[in-house]
From Swiss-Prot:
PANTHER family: ATP-DEPENDENT CLP PROTEASE ATP-BINDING SUBUNIT CLPX-LIKE, MITOCHONDRIAL, ATP-DEPENDENT CLP PROTEASE ATP-BINDING SUBUNIT CLPX-LIKE, MITOCHONDRIAL-RELATED. CDD domains: RecA-like_ClpX (cd19497). ATP-dependent specificity component of the Clp protease. It directs the protease to specific substrates. Can perform chaperone functions in the absence of ClpP. InterPro entries: AAA+_ATPase, ATP-dep_Clp_protease_ClpX, ATPase_AAA_core, Clp_ATPase_C, Clp_protease_ATP-bd_su_ClpX, ClpX_bact, P-loop_NTPase, Znf_CppX_C4. Belongs to the ClpX chaperone family. It comes from Francisella tularensis subsp. tularensis (strain SCHU S4 / Schu 4). This is ATP-dependent Clp protease ATP-binding subunit ClpX. Keywords: ATP-binding, Chaperone, Metal-binding, Nucleotide-binding, Zinc. It comes from the Bacteria. One of its GO terms (cellular component) is HslUV protease complex.
Length: 417
């Protein structure tokens, strides 16, 4: 006589239910399987609700937060604050489905020179909103089937940063850097394949607009019979950034064409515009002439320009933000019970050096690391040094920093080596 099976969860026998599945240490009936599935589904939905936008910061609050970490770029801050607020407001609106009006998402295009803060903007916004964040380099992307990263691998990175919580990843932010580097070479469509240019732009279209993307859990190429994770990109905010070097000529050419005939005074005015003011005049047709396809431009409706950072901006970046570089080095030296001090003129010379190298804010850390290398190497082994002073001669003439001992004597670095 066959042994009667009982469900380990509800206790019902196999005669009382449709089916019972046996495992190594227990059994489960079809009714309990349904209840478990429902429980998992409801738990999954709460995971999506973990990112609650009921207390979403208002644009003014978002800008205030950006002010704490980013110097200058006021117009870009306002544009991004409104864009981010509207994006996440749109998500909650679409969830409620009060009416048939569906709000389309507005992805962002940031245009600005190297080191102007494009990546920092995206990182800071993700930190404020506590959403997963991923960075991709457009120059490494290729169309599916070619050597390089598939565009869908961007989603894999976001998933990894969300600890593979799909619901959280679907509310995240993706920053695609160097989008200008995948511009097609000419306005006319090429009959040859352009796997790292127009082809990548085409591949990005659906992803940025919103699609259900099937991605391999560990990235890489897709293979037959491979388990895939389904990720809906409809609510992911895409921020694309690029320097668009040389686009000023495209803008100027368009403006000069408009200002012909009797408008010679207007032409003169256009010619005298500096680079920053000229960039503020950018329009969609300029981006098309530069090499972005119109369809991609249409999916990046919010365009904002970041100005090139001036000397005074870089000095402020060194000292003012919450995580300013100088504050970071002060903290590092404190671990060795040493104070470090930078003179005002030293900060100016560091800023000038970054401008000369055309690296913007991005190059400030490299300059400081080079200046402080020997000090950071030897100071931990010297117990009597209390203070390090960096003046302009250390930056300009590569002189050794001034070292002060606990007895207020001054030493040179060579004295403690």
């Amino acid at each position: 006589m066959a042994k009667i099976l009982y469900c380990s969860f509800c206790g019902k026998s196999q005669q009382e239910v449709k089916n019972i599945i046996s495992g190594r240490d227990g059994n489960i009936c079809n009714e309990c399987v349904s209840k478990c599935a429902e429980k998992i589904r409801s738990t999954g939905s709460t995971s999506a609700e973990d990112i609650s936008f009921e207390k979403l910061p208002k644009p003014v609050e978002i800008k205030k937060y950006l002010d704490d970490y980013i110097i200058g770029q006021d117009n870009a801050k306002k544009v991004l604050s409104v864009a981010v607020y509207n994006h996440y407001k749109r998500i909650t609106s679409n969830l409620t489905k009060d009416d048939d009006t569906e709000l389309k998402k507005s992805n962002v295009l940031l245009i600005g020179p190297t080191g102007s803060g494009k990546t920092l903007f995206a990182q800071t916004l993700a930190k404020l909103l506590n959403v997963p964040f991923a960075i991709a380099d457009a120059t490494t992307l290729t169309e599916a089937g070619y050597v390089g990263d598939d565009v869908e691998n961007i989603i894999v990175r976001l998933l990894q940063n969300a600890d593979f919580d799909v619901a959280k990843a679907q509310k995240g932010i993706i920053y695609i850097d160097e989008i200008d580097k995948i511009a097609r070479k000419s306005e006319s469509t090429s009959i040859t394949r352009d796997v790292s240019g127009e082809g990548v732009q085409q591949a990005l279209l659906k992803l940025i607009e919103g699609t259900v993307s099937s991605v391999p859990p560990k990235g890489g190429r897709k293979h037959p019979n491979q388990d895939m994770i389904q990720v809906d990109t409809s609510d992911i905010l895409f921020i694309c950034g690029g320097a668009f070097a040389g686009i000023e000529k495209v803008i100027k050419h368009r403006m000069d064409k408009v200002s012909i005939g009797f408008n010679s005074d207007v032409i003169q005015q256009k010619n005298s515009l500096d680079s920053d003011k000229l960039m503020q005049k950018i329009e969609s047709e300029d981006l098309t002439r530069f090499g972005l396809i119109p369809e991609l431009i249409g999916r990046l409706p919010i365009v904002t320009v970041l100005n090139e950072l001036k000397e005074e901006d870089l000095v402020r970046i060194l000292t003012e933000p919450k995580n300013a570089l100088i504050k970071q080095y002060i903290k590092l030296f404190k671990f060795d019970n040493v104070n470090i001090e930078f003179t005002d003129q030293a900060l100016v010379e560091i800023a000038k050096k970054a401008i000369t190298k055309k690296t913007g804010a991005r190059g400030l850390r490299t300059i400081l690391e080079n200046v402080l290398l020997e000090v950071m190497f030897h100071i931990p082994s010297s117990e009597d040094i209390e203070k390090v002073i960096i003046n302009d001669k250390v930056i300009l003439e590569q002189q050794e920093p001034i070292l002060a001992t606990k007895t207020q004597q001054q030493k040179q670095l060579k004295d403690i080596i």
